[in-house]
């Protein structure tokens, strides 16, 4: 039986935003499942229990942006879940400066909804059994720059430094933007590499 991979989308996005990666995973022989949740109206209180229910059978995870924070929080809240590998795509695991800045603006907190605290606080250092890999981007195209000032390279929404926490099995920076990760062949190659081997192919970081 093929390995299950749960795909988790990010803030303000539908689960269909992960379909491109789902197709690539299925083509590679994986059983891809799209997980959807209400990022603004529902928040982690609803999403984390629903995600945990999907993770009680052996699987891996591919998660974009807020989805990566959500996935690690779910695993940290129930350490025995049989998840082998997690690939995060531009996830602000250290917290998002852009989201924090947006939350301080009039109506900004309402825009982020119940996910505001998750984006602000990020995750604790990773100490779980699953191998977690992070793909960050350094093509600064995105609205995040309007709300927050980034220190160092960023993908337009999340800075590279915001994607680094202790305990990651591997971390790679690719020339892609935050939304570009959703349709990048370069990113897809690295996702498949990590799922298969638990590490990224760093020699291919700049290849098209």
Where are these regions (language model features)?
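C-terminal catalytic-base region of ester-bond hydrolases, centering on the histidine
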Residues: 129-208
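Serine-dependent carboxylesterase/thioesterase catalytic core
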Residues: 3-11, 15-20, 24-26, 31-131, ...
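Polar low-complexity intrinsically disordered regions
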Residues: 1, 66, 204-208
């Amino acid at each position: 039986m093929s390995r299950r991979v749960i795909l988790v989308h990010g803030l303000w996005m539908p689960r269909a935003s992960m379909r491109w990666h789902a197709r690539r995973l299925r083509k590679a022989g994986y059983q891809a499942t799209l997980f959807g949740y209400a990022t603004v109206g529902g928040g982690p209180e609803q999403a984390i229990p629903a995600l945990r229910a999907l993770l009680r059978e052996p699987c891996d995870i591919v998660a974009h942006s807020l989805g990566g924070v959500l996935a690690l929080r779910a695993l940290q809240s129930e350490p025995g879940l049989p998840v082998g590998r997690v690939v995060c795509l531009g996830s602000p695991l250290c917290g998002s400066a852009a989201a924090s800045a947006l939350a301080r603006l009039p109506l900004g907190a309402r825009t982020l909804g119940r996910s505001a605290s998750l984006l602000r606080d990020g995750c604790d250092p990773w100490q779980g059994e699953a191998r977690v890999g992070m793909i960050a981007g350094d093509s600064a195209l995105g609205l995040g720059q309007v709300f927050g000032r980034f220190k160092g390279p960023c993908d337009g929404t999340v800075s590279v430094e915001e994607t680094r926490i202790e305990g990651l099995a591997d971390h790679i920076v690719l020339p892609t933007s935050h939304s570009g990760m959703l349709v990048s062949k370069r990113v897809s190659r690295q996702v498949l590499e990590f799922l298969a081997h638990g590490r990224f192919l760093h020699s291919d970081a700049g290849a098209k």
